[in-house]
UniProtKB/Swiss-Prot annotation:
InterPro entries the record matches: ADP-Glc_PPase (IPR011831), ADP_Glu_pyroP_CS (IPR005836), GlgC_bac (IPR023049), GlmU/GlgC-like_hexapep (IPR056818), NTP_transferase_dom (IPR005835), Nucleotide-diphossugar_trans (IPR029044), Trimer_LpxA-like_sf (IPR011004)
Pfam family, any one: NTP_transferase
Record's protein name: Glucose-1-phosphate adenylyltransferase
PANTHER family given in the database record: GLUCOSE-1-PHOSPHATE ADENYLYLTRANSFERASE (PTHR43523:SF2), GLUCOSE-1-PHOSPHATE ADENYLYLTRANSFERASE-RELATED (PTHR43523)
Function: Involved in the biosynthesis of ADP-glucose, a building block required for the elongation reactions to produce glycogen. Catalyzes the reaction between ATP and alpha-D-glucose 1-phosphate (G1P) to produce pyrophosphate and ADP-Glc.
Enzyme Commission code: 2.7.7.27
Reactions that this protein is recorded to catalyse: alpha-D-glucose 1-phosphate + ATP + H(+) = ADP-alpha-D-glucose + diphosphate
Top-level taxon of origin: Bacteria
Keyword Cell membrane: no
Keywords: ATP-binding, Carbohydrate metabolism, Glycogen biosynthesis, Glycogen metabolism, Nucleotide-binding, Nucleotidyltransferase, Transferase
Gene Ontology BP, a term: glycogen biosynthetic process
Organism: Corynebacterium aurimucosum (strain ATCC 700975 / DSM 44827 / CIP 107346 / CN-1) (Corynebacterium nigricans)
UniProt-listed PROSITE patterns: ADP_GLC_PYROPHOSPH_1, ADP_GLC_PYROPHOSPH_2, ADP_GLC_PYROPHOSPH_3
Amino acid sequence: MRSLPNVLAIVLAGGEGKRLFPLTEDRAKPAVPFGGSYRLIDFVLSNLVNAGFLKIAVLTQYKSHSLDRHISQAWNLSGPTPQYIASVPAQQRRGKRWYNGSADAILQSLNLIYDEKPDYVIVFGADHVYRMDPAQMVEEHIATGLDCSVAGIRVPRSEASAFGCIQADGMGTITEFVEKPENPPATPDDPNMTYASMGNYVFTTQALIDALLEDEKNEDSAHDMGGNIIPYFVEREQAHVYDFMANEVPGSTERDHGYWRDVGTIDSFYEAHMDMISVHPIFNLYNRSWPIHSTDDSNFPPAKFVQNGIAQSSMVAPGCIVSGGTVRNSVLASDVHVADGATVEGSVILPGVRIGRGAVVRHAILDKNVVVSDGAIIGVDRERDEERFKVSEGGVVVVGKNVKV
């Protein structure tokens, strides 16, 4: 077993996720159900725990009740050892205010760092879908001798303008960090690719503290990790890019190696689900060497198919009953019922949904506890759908939580 340095992991989970509305109308973005049996935050927490980092503070703020409950129930590391995954709301330790940016969230939580006295601090986002061994990034960070490391994923330059982009020299030292540039910088070894920031960072502890305290003094700062703190280290030639493609996750395949998705929009959220349901999926949830952990479905019996109910090229979670209906190219979360003659195709169905007899659901996302009445149709007539629901640019119909159609 490898020896790990003294590390505190901080997960930024206070995001509102406006672009995922209505899925984020009643919950924080990291609490949005994903992949049938998980929530978005389960991916980063699984990566940290699988790597052996067991002191994790999850900083929460926006509509965090379901997220807090999930962390306490699904991620309870109780026992005699000093390990924990703790949900930490805004403490107002530096004034009567809530978190004002991601850097301010960590600033207000400096007591956690002072108490733990780690040598290094990992700061990861909570709402991306991927597998990664963070210990490999920490090892490379230590080897560089620099104060800050930023995980970068290689994306085509033609698509990189949507991201924070990294320009680095041949040694991996970051020379420029720019948000959503019109002309993204190339990687040192490929003129057609750009390093896009994944929002995952490793810091030498005292250097991070100094940067946060300096940023606090700047009244013009947005107090943002990517917009302010990382440029602070870049200006001092103390930032290193960690190439995500160099990360070797046990059990990964050539097809899903390096998979990472920002699911911040309805279309990207939908597409990430479709990535999982092929025979040879782009993202493989069935890698037992690096599992994605969750216990949301622990109290449900196995899925059941009766009266010629079928599911093809789909993932169906425990507790589902497909009774005479047909499910194709879809992801069904726990406790979904599909009645006789109903068709669900190319859709993402969140927990507790009821789909009535003869109903049709196509190219849609149904949030928790939606009831689709007998014979109702969703995703067939776009004009009609736009009158009733949100329809994304890509044509995905989204029905909000607890709605009856």
